[in-house]
Amino acid sequence: MGETAIIPLFYHQDIEINKKVIKACYDGGARVFEFTNRGIQAHHLFSELKRWASEEMDDLILGVGSIVDAGTAALFIQEGADFVVSPIVNVEMAKVCNRRKIAWIPGCATLSEINFAEELGAEIVKLFPAAQIGGPDFIKSVLGPNHWSSLMPSGGVLPEQENLEKWFKAGAYCVGLGSKLIIKNKNGDYDYEKIRTLTKDTINFARDIKSQVE
């Protein structure tokens, strides 16, 4: 996650649209992708996507996001999730992921939550909603006493050099990007070529910025 520095996240009820979006991001250089758990049949879609990705792009790390309970985490792990992202800190979810040695990325909004999540085994912590809880300045404040923390802001991050500079210069480990990266054309259809090029440009921006601050 730190290598490409961005994590695209997406969900659609149409399996083919999911595949095209994932492929566009992959072709743009993304090697980690978060499928968000937003629909009733999301786990069935994920299962098919995982099998497809294993055959078509075997170096893609495909995980699941928007998980809020241990049972759902276990279900997606059984379907092959490489990591689990949550908007909350949940002790039972941490136990499930740790038992299966699956990376668990909980969502936190305070320094106390971040420390608690790390005590539960979280190597990376999601800051959510990042813009609303203080943005880049919040990251700077956290990394003062917690210089070892790996923070992934999500919510309010833009695939633009100026915006990315603020997050990474503040100390972000990586960033989550959704609808601002996975964009549509004027007709309302997903613009897969634009998604590919925007992913490529965003990764290049992020890597350049991180190389300057590390």
Regions flagged by a language model, labelled:
Residues 19-23, 74, 95, 115-118, ...:
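Alpha-helical segments flanking ligand/cofactor-binding loops in enzyme cores
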Residues 26-31, 77-84, 98-105, 119-126, ...:
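Glycine-enriched alpha-helix->loop->beta-strand junction motifs that scaffold or abut catalytic
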Residues 1-71, 75-79, 169, 189-212:
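Conserved N-terminal beta1-alpha1 strand-loop-helix module at the mouth
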Residues 5-10, 33-35, 60-65, 84-85, ...:
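Hydrophobic faces of well-ordered beta-strands that scaffold small-molecule active sites
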Residues 31-39, 72, 77-79, 100, ...:
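Glycine/Thr-rich beta-alpha phosphate-binding loop at enzyme active sites
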